[in-house]
């Protein structure tokens, strides 16, 4: 799954530390999500979308076969 977390984070002026704090996760979790090494749980993905005031589908993109 591709994602645009880094793009949205920078657009909103958040550091990785600040986003992690807002989501109550570690900075390493944010790094792993941004690098595509970790797919967040549904609740975490929904919270990320809520923070950026958008829908999950705008941030997380399913890779086409």
Enumerate the language-model features and the residues they cover.
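DNA major-groove recognition helix of helix-turn-helix/homeodomain DNA-binding modules
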Residues: 44-58
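Short basic helix-loop element that most often maps to the first helix and adjoining turn
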Residues: 3-22
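Short N-terminal alpha-helical targeting/association segments
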Residues: 1, 20, 26-29, 49-50
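Short, Lys/Arg-enriched C-terminal cap helix and immediately downstream tail that follows
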Residues: 8, 42-43
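Short, charged recognition helix plus adjacent turn
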Residues: 61-65
């Amino acid at each position: 799954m591709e994602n645009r977390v880094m793009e949205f984070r920078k657009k909103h002026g958040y550091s990785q530390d600040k986003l992690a704090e807002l989501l109550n996760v570690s900075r390493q979790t944010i790094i792993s999500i941004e690098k595509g090494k970790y797919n967040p749980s549904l609740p975490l993905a929904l919270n990320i979308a809520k923070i950026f005031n958008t829908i999950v589908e705008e941030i997380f993109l399913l890779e086409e076969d």
